[in-house]
Amino acid sequence: MRISDRGYGEEGRERLTLVPENVDDLWHLAHVLEPGDLVEGDTTRRIQRNDDQMRDTGGQREHLFVTLQVDEVEFARFANRLRVSGVIVGCSREDQLNAHHTINVEEHDEITVEKHFKPDQTERLEEATEAAENPDVAIATVEEGAAYVHTVQQYGTEEYASFTKPTGKGDYSRPREELFAELGEALAHLDADAVILAGPGFTKQDALDYITEEYRDLADRITTVDTSAAGDRGVHEVLKRGAVDEVQKETRISKEATLIDDLTAEIAQGAKATYGPEDVAEAAEFGAIETLLVVDDRLRTERQGEGDWSIDVNEVIESVEQQGGDVVVFSSEFAPGEQLSNLGGIAAILRYRLQ
């Protein structure tokens, strides 16, 4: 994320001109923008001339500069765009005021956001800005007969490629080198800045030997990690062990994987942890929260007034921060966020055990 300008609007609202530089940045914006915010940007709108009246039911598209009062925000993950919908409150054509419209924000599009930013939203934007300096990382996991490649995003990991077929002896088996060749070709095509090669046993080392010999450009980018499995389970082990941090300093998802493991361990011991909105709010009142964990999509729903929590989540967050606790907003796109959702969407690691 690049912040190209800062200022202030009416009623003390902060104005930030932002340029999302990748799909991660669009995802961050989806969790920063809320109903009532103002978003300015270039767009196109279908205009039809009909007795000198303008409407958007047909005709040619015209370029406009609009300010929307936001009603709804949607991160279209597979289209690599952010859809910001709302009412036009400012426009280069006055006849379009008060009409409903949607701005499609894509990578490298510039928009200006005017709103009262909450502390966790400011932190999210700062995180996105700092992450622009991190290298792209791929995790390749391999075991006998199977190999997988995952890309590491800030909102989670995504499977980029998978190759499964028995290797070794048998009528339907194939030479291991064929599997390693497919893996090497996928990694070369992905062209990540760093590759973590993981898996159980000696298969991982054999794959490394093959790839460094046949794909020499990849050799200096690969580090290896021992895991008990390949695929999603192996990826989780890589993240939990902090292997991604070694090449990317710190990533959101490796931090989340460690925190959710710490939380579930404390819960299993009946120790310093609590979960669910009411219990977490009570812990915040006692000043007992060391780290507050909340899922991004649930946080957004509650802030929009569409949730069913009986607590004010903003008050809980402010209370935790005022008492020196940390607040971590989990991605719902990744396994730790799913685990946290199953615990009610909000939980806390405590400074001390509550009776």
UniProtKB/Swiss-Prot annotation:
Gene3D superfamilies: 3.30.1330.30, eRF1 domain 2, Pelota, domain A
GO molecular function: endonuclease activity; metal ion binding
Subcellular location, record wording: Cytoplasm
EC class: hydrolase
GO biological process, one term: nuclear-transcribed mRNA catabolic process, non-stop decay
Assigned keywords, A-Z: Cytoplasm, Endonuclease, Hydrolase, Metal-binding, Nuclease
Domain of life the protein comes from: Archaea
Disulphide bridges: none
One CC-aspect GO term: cytoplasm
EC number(s) given by UniProt: 3.1.-.-
UniProt keyword Chaperone, yes or no: no
Co-factor requirement: a divalent metal cation
Functional description taken from the UniProt entry: May function in recognizing stalled ribosomes, interact with stem-loop structures in stalled mRNA molecules, and effect endonucleolytic cleavage of the mRNA. May play a role in the release non-functional ribosomes and degradation of damaged mRNAs. Has endoribonuclease activity.
Assembly and binders: Monomer.
Free-text domain note: The N-terminal domain has the RNA-binding Sm fold. It harbors the endoribonuclease activity.
Similarity section: Belongs to the eukaryotic release factor 1 family. Pelota subfamily.
Cited NCBIfam families: pelota
Name of the protein this chain belongs to: Protein pelota homolog
